[in-house]
């Protein structure tokens, strides 16, 4: 058997594009893409850690990214979706946050949240600047908060008829740490009333209101529904697919998938 036909085991690897280019084994979940599109525009998925949530959203980002329009075969040629592409393939700019990077120490929390959001918004501007008018990045950075920068991106993209897919990984990482380490009072400061995290989700809802808004889709993952319940009472546009039978095998392995993996491994021993 030729060496390049043997798939590597991508232990700890959640970068879908690297996994594909390095010829690593991938349990194909791309047949869920049409179901995700049909389900709703703004989705929440709760699963335990180490279940493959990050790999899933990295796959979705690779599929929907407008910058990958010419790399479909390279990234998905071996997947189910290659023979069944949807109309939304490569139609979005991808805006991503991963809140595991936020410092949960109460004295640093809000500042760290702003820093993380700013970093991701700068990455977004660098990646898609060619789609906007000259001076877009400079105008974006003249705004002083994550909320005003999000609003500027959304309004500018809407005017240009561009589309945004927002992905948030580990949305509840720092809030779970606050609750378990610093207690309920500190947790409530961020997630209740005028708390900054609750306000962030209110802003997201606002950015989807109106006709022709660029922020068209969201996919948000986490490990617990606790924060979801606390910050999203005003964000009542999201659909929680966690317990939906349709998405039971969206992440993790089924018995059939695991058996197939083991059989291929035995063949190559």
Predicted regions and their residues:
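Conserved small/polar residues in nucleotide/adenosyl-binding loops
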Residues: 267-269
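Short glycine-rich substrate-engagement loop in P-loop NTPases that contacts/grips substrate
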Residues: 137-152
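Substrate-engagement module of ASCE P-loop NTPases
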Residues: 152-157, 187-215
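Conserved P-loop NTPase "ATPase switch" module shared by AAA+ and STAND
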Residues: 161-190
């Amino acid at each position: 058997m030729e060496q390049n036909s043997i798939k590597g085991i991508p232990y700890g690897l959640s970068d879908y594009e690297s996994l594909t280019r390095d010829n690593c084994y991938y349990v194909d979940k791309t047949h869920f893409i049409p179901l995700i599109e049909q389900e709703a525009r703004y989705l929440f998925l709760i699963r335990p850690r180490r279940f493959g949530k990050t790999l899933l959203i990295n796959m979705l980002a690779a599929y929907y990214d407008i910058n990958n329009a010419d790399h479909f075969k390279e990234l998905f040629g071996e997947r189910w979706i290659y023979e069944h592409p949807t109309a939304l393939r490569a139609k979005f700019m991808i805006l991503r946050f991963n809140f595991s990077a936020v410092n949960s120490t109460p004295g640093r929390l809000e500042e760290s949240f702003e820093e993380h959001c700013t970093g991701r918004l700068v990455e977004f501007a660098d990646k898609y600047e060619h789609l906007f008018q000259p001076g877009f990045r400079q105008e974006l950075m003249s705004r002083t908060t994550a909320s005003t920068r999000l609003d500027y991106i959304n309004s500018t993209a809407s005017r240009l008829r561009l589309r945004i897919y927002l992905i948030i990984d580990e949305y509840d990482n720092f809030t779970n740490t606050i609750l378990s380490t610093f207690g309920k009072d500190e947790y409530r400061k961020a997630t209740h009333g005028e708390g900054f995290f609750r306000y962030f989700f209110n802003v997201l809802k606002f950015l989807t209101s109106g006709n022709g808004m660029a922020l068209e889709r969201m996919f948000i993952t986490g490990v617990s529904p606790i924060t979801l319940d606390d910050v999203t009472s005003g964000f009542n546009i999201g659909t929680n697919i966690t317990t939906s039978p349709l998405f039971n095998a969206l992440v993790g392995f089924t018995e059939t998938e695991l058996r197939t993996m083991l059989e291929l491994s035995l063949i190559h021993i």
